[in-house]
């Protein structure tokens, strides 16, 4: 038997090259799938201590994308997707509406379900007759109060199609209002514009958005009928990308799940994983996958390689899979500890990277905040940990029918230092990538994937690469040991 050598991020360094590229001018745009572009090559992990709607919103505003985890009921996960799609919507087409005969109770129920603060009021023909805002509802005493009593029906701020953003902003400023109704020539409601959305568009010019100006969001699903039903609900909620998320993507079940998910919609992209070999990549592309997620056991909280003895060191896995994928994007999932690892993953052939531990300690992550020995931490666990598997992710590790005391975990539960806003972490990650692009003379992500060269280093070389012979007295925001 021939035993092949394989490398990971700490085994190599990028070789500097002649460069006219300034880090500030480097182009970090990339394709996460064949049809969806990102402005920064980053995804947040589909983990229950990393990504729900708050993280997904932050990721999309920064130019990346969040993948909402699936340790939620189908309806809960779909609700998280809807929250992202409605957070910064440009023009909200087909907004949630009320009729004059509905009640305050109906409005509250819709408010809770869709996380919105106001509703256009329309008649049976779809013509605008009023608007109800959160302020109007606060002054109503009874749940059976009709909408017609609460709504504002006079001097409505209405803009006819085609709606111009600058005209809309001027009208809202002149009328001192936060919502603007958009109608067609017959007075029928076609959309809704909010002041918040117009302001967010200015604050986040590189946000990752769909054709309608809504933030993009992905969500995880699984195999079998349960996965198909979940995928259907996610499509109905407006998800942009479905991730068939399993520990071992090279299986007939995953390939079949890709085929079924692709049949749901021509608009939604399907990512499949996780894999670590060229053969697996070819199988999933043959099933119709729009991108491949690479990584068997490299994550900081993953114990698959110790429990099962299976995996491929991440750098080699990325290189093998990217070569086999051709023009189908590859996502490097796991093992990234520093921004330099992120740059190495891109140089190895990944179109983008997925990070978990680096974002788990941020404000936007759903993990519990813990105070320990005078410092703040946030809970972080692998989806193969006992706690996560008991909550619903056991099928990711093909243990769906196992009793809770018979589960064989492939991950641990722990904590990571509190890091503040996720935006700061993303800034440092992308800043490190830009620095690498400057050092290697690569103006674009595609050039970096194609032109970079590696040099293999020894243990002494790794020691030399880290801070040495000094005691750190003030921590850096992008470098931490232990």
Q: Locations of the language-model features?
A:
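Alpha/beta catalytic cores of nucleotide-metabolism and tRNA/nucleoside-modifying enzymes
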Residues: 1-20, 98, 160, 170, ...
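Bateman/CBS regulatory modules and CBS-like beta-alpha motifs in cytosolic regions of diverse proteins
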Residues: 24-39, 45-47, 76-116, 121-123, ...
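Hydrophobic faces of well-ordered beta-strands that scaffold small-molecule active sites
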Residues: 42-45, 64-68, 94-96, 157, ...
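Catalytic cores of alpha/beta
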Residues: 54-58, 229-237, 270, 276-294, ...
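Glycine-rich phosphate-binding active-site loops on the catalytic face of alpha/beta enzymes
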Residues: 61-76, 239-251, 290-308, 336-370
